[in-house]
Design a protein with these regions (language model features):
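Acetyl-CoA-dependent GNAT
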Residues: 6-10, 17-88, 92-94, 105-107, ...
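Active-site acidic-Proline motif in GNAT/NAT acetyltransferases
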Residues: 92-94, 98, 127
Length: 161
């Protein structure tokens, strides 16, 4: 059975332990675990999960604060008042195409709206045409900015809630 919900502290740990295990040898994932757990604890972000039979299989995080490292102070991406950033959308390969991330994003958008956010931004590498197409289909169709990140061109779009 699939569940789509806010990540509890235990589920948040399980998600990050899974991510770290899938990226053995890449120490950055351990740093991100600490960072995102801290963001969830202090209200700078909220992580949501897709679970299957109690195990995490997908995730996404809403970043509210411009101080989150992925936002890097760019107020057009997240400003802590009316604009949040949708970050780190992931789903296990075996569940891709099943609509699970779409369902999770709808829950995340409602969560943001209920807390006064009226705009959500999302970014994708320019070469990820499939993801860009999906985001446009979801209504993220107002171009916000672009920048180079880790050697890739990332395009950011916004959706008004």
């Amino acid at each position: 059975m699939f569940r789509y919900e806010e990540a509890s502290p235990d589920m948040l740990n399980a998600v990050w332990d899974k991510n770290i295990a899938e990226h053995t040898g890449d120490e950055q994932w351990k740093h991100w675990k600490e960072e995102y757990i801290s963001y969830n604890s202090n209200g700078s972000a909220k992580t949501f999960t897709v679970s299957y039979d109690g195990s995490p299989v997908g995730e996404g995080t809403l970043l509210f604060s411009p101080q989150c490292s992925a936002v890097r102070g760019r107020l057009e991406l997240a400003n802590g008042t009316d604009t949040a950033n949708l970050n780190a959308l992931r789903i296990d390969k075996r569940f891709e195409g099943g609509g699970h991330i779409s369902k999770l994003v709808k829950i995340m958008e409602k969560y943001a709206f209920d807390r006064g956010f009226r705009h959500i931004t999302i970014g994708a590498e320019a070469r990820e045409t499939r993801n860009l197409s999906i985001y446009l289909h979801w209504g993220y169709n107002r171009f916000v900015t672009s920048c180079g990140e880790e050697g890739a061109l990332v395009l950011y779009y916004q959706k008004d809630l």
